[in-house]
Amino acid sequence: MLYRSLIALIAFLAMVPAAMAAEWEEGTHYRTLSEPVETRSGDQLELAEVFWYGCPSCYSMQPVIEEWKETKPDDVNLRHVPASLRRDWAPHAKAFYAARQLGVVDGIHSELFDALAGERRDLNDVDAIAAFFEEQGVAEASEVRDAWGSFAVDTAMRRGRQFQQGAKVTGTPTLVVEGKYVISVRAAGSYENMLAIADHLLEKERSGD
C-alpha cells in the first residue's frame, strides 16, 4: 500500500511542471507587448531583469535569480536593466552602468543591493558611490567618476530608459522575455513564479509557438 502511494506521489510530482506551465495565461500572469522592445543579446534568447538597487522586493528576489542562473540554459542571456523610473533612482542606475564600463559588475552588484536595499545607506550621488566602490576594493574613486561622466554610460542610461518606456515597466522587479513578454511579481504571485513563467515563455520562443 505504501509502495503504491509513493508511486502515485512520484507520478503526480512529475506532472506538476507541465500542469503549471499550462496555467500561465497571457493577460493574467504576463502581458504581451504590442510592439516588442529592442533586445541586446545577439543570437541568444534574452531575459531582462529590470531592477532598482534600493528596492526591497528586488533585493529579496536576488537569491532566486542566482539560483536560476546556476541552471540557466546556454542559449539564454540574463540582461540587467537598472530602473530609472524616478529621478532619485537615476544615480543607482548610473552606478550599475559605471560598474559595467569598468568591468566590475560581479564585484559590486550584490554589495550595492546590500548597501541600498539592505542597509539603506545614503549613496545618492557620484561622490558617495565612487567612495563606496573604492571602499569595496573594486575600483578607484577617480575611475568611477571618469566612467560616470563617459559617453558610454550616458548612452547606456538613455537606452535603458527607452527599454523601460517601450516595455511599459511601472515597477520593480520586472522581467522582460525576448523583448516581447512582461512579467511583474504582482501578476506572477511570487519570485519563483516569475522565473517559471519566464522559462515557459523562453521555451515558447524556442519552439516558435
Show the residue positions of the predicted features:
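Extracytoplasmic thiol/disulfide redox context detector
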Residues: 2-87, 161, 166, 202-209
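A short alpha-helix capping/helix-coil boundary motif
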Residues: 45-46, 73-76, 107-111, 138-141, ...
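Sec/Tat-exported extracytoplasmic proteins
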Residues: 54, 69-72, 99-103, 112, ...
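Structural microenvironment flanking redox-active thiols in thiol-disulfide oxidoreductases
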Residues: 73-102, 107-133
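C-terminal cap of thioredoxin/glutaredoxin-like
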Residues: 135-209
